[in-house]
């Protein structure tokens, strides 16, 4: 993808880059604790409203949104609970191909984090739904060499969403509907 405004992309990346490196560190702690593999941790990407905002496709974003694929995901997940990621009670009581977690604590009064974990499905499915922009290749120490991936096909609903997840997705979709290029 060719960036329309590279300077603006870099400015926005500065805003979320430190949060992304923190998320990469969090995933590496999960790996060290045996909750995921290195390949799982490396699948972390900025997604949804945040990636669209980074790419200049939306004027704002509601959360700093991430996606990750963890093949053998343990749910409920004590490591994510330790890092103050919350899930709905309805989600906590079901087994599914994806789980949405929110974190309002780490960057309190600044921004909320959204983490969607895809599991028990092909890794490619984590790119199949939602907005088509993804920013990848964050490391624990740098966000300067990221790669932008844009899905070419329309979104495919991978799973039926819980009410909680649907409200979050609807909030993001409102940004898209209310934004005119």
From Swiss-Prot:
Lineage: superkingdom: Viruses
Function: Plays a role in late gene expression.
Protein name: Protein AC41
Origin species: Autographa californica nuclear polyhedrosis virus
Recorded name of the encoding gene: AC41
